[in-house]
Amino acid sequence: LKKRKVNILNHPGEHAGSNDANARRKYGVRGNFRDSDGELIALKNYMDAQYFGEIGIGTPPQKFTVIFDTGSSNLWVPSSKCYFSVACLFHSKYRSTDSTTYKKNGKSAAIQYGTGSISGFFSQDSVKLGDLLVKEQDFIEATKEPGITFLAAKFDGILGLGFQEISVGDAVPVWYTMLNQGLVQEPVFSFWLNRNADEQEGGELVFGGVDPNHFKGEHTYVPVTQKGYWQFEMGDVLIGDKTTGFCASGCAAIADSGTSLLAGTTTIVTQINQAIGAAGVMSQQCKSLVDQYGKSMIEMLLSEEQPEKICSQMKLCSFDGSHDTSMIIESVVDKSKGKSSGLPMRCVPCARWVVWMQNQIRQNETEENIINYVDKLCERLPSPMGESAVDCSSLSSMPNIAFTVGGKTFNLSPEQYVLKVGEGATAQCISGFTAMDVAPPHGPLWILGDVFMGQYHTVFDYGNLRVGFAEAA
């Protein structure tokens, strides 16, 4: 791991809230960044699905490969006391008896991730990242890694770069300790993820700066709206140049380096699946209900001033479909700004149809075309958190998918949002979009994982509590 000088961008002057001001006072940071040294951590790229780097824990350092995860806040590695989990047999394990700087804690801990979990206990020791030595850092020794999630993983553990608000056990995150000990001059870190898995350089994480070699133009910054995750407000999602009609009034989004794909609401992912020909899960119940109630819903949409009440009036709230977020349904009559539907969770599949139908009505489609369109969308309903396959030979005919962030449109081409596994006749193509529905008040929510961050160099600006995106280079 080499260290080289990286520049700090001069950020435009912005009004800083109390949290920003407190951060600057605490770390002695001025409003604008200045040139300084940043610590560069080289990352390895495994099939565009996992990006990991090396750290050392203890004295002398015991080496571990970790995912640097902006979607969580704890550091954990397998423990030498992990006796009964098969996953521990295939990964490096921390031995406290081999470290002269180890301090016992012993407090139990457990973390649940989207696709797996770990449990163990807290310990304290030094953590080495490149040339930076973080002293007296609390971390978790994992003694249980159930299931197969971590068994085949190319990494040993996870180093969280989220906020302390979501830290299990309220442990101080490594990034916070790094700042408190004055190891970096500026409270900012940045990611470049190389999407060419064949190249030797898989990517890089820079603590305390940004690398100008890996982005073009200026970063577009958006404020963090909820500390915990690196969460911000995102605007409309476009398929081609057409709105999906769901996030036009705003959706929450999280920049998450620990998630491989783009995860979003079933409502939009279904529309994307239909547009790119992804093979989703057929829902016969969805199709039969649309055939039965579709025409009546269209008639009510054309006349009803409060479309959010249509589903309950039609007694469709008993339909128990896949989990979804609260819907934002916009009136077709006055095209007023979207309001929260207020529908209970079981009503959401019906509300999803309302959104789809409204989009078609706006495009002056006929009743027959609207019914056929929604019927086809039923066939494309994805499995929650499931992957969808696409035809590798059809990429040239697929549309761009775009996200609106900070008033700017960030495009993804089919070559960028489709993951190709293998070569030649045996190649398989996986859609980079997966369904993940979050209940209010936290939803509707998108997770912009490596598929997005690989195309857009990402700056996590803790001092000003904002996230920045620029075209990667």
Curated annotation (Swiss-Prot):
Gene Ontology biological process: lipid metabolic process; proteolysis
UniProt keywords, alphabetically: Aspartyl protease, Disulfide bond, Glycoprotein, Hydrolase, Protease, Zymogen
Catalytic site positions: 69, 256
Propeptide section residues: 1-33
KW Heme (keyword) present: no
Residues bearing glycans: 364
One Pfam short name: Asp
Enzyme class: hydrolase
Tissues expressed in: Mostly present in the violet parts of styles and corollas of mature flowers.
Boundaries of every Saposin B-type domain copy: 281-384
EC number: 3.4.23.-
Listed GO MF terms: aspartic-type endopeptidase activity
Stretches assigned to the Peptidase A1 domain: 51-470
Keyword Transmembrane helix listed: no
InterPro entries attached to this UniProt entry: Aspartic_peptidase_A1, Aspartic_peptidase_AS, PEPTIDASE_A1, Peptidase_aspartic_dom_sf, Phytepsin, SapB_1, SapB_2, Saposin-like
Protein family membership: Belongs to the peptidase A1 family.
Protein name: Cyprosin
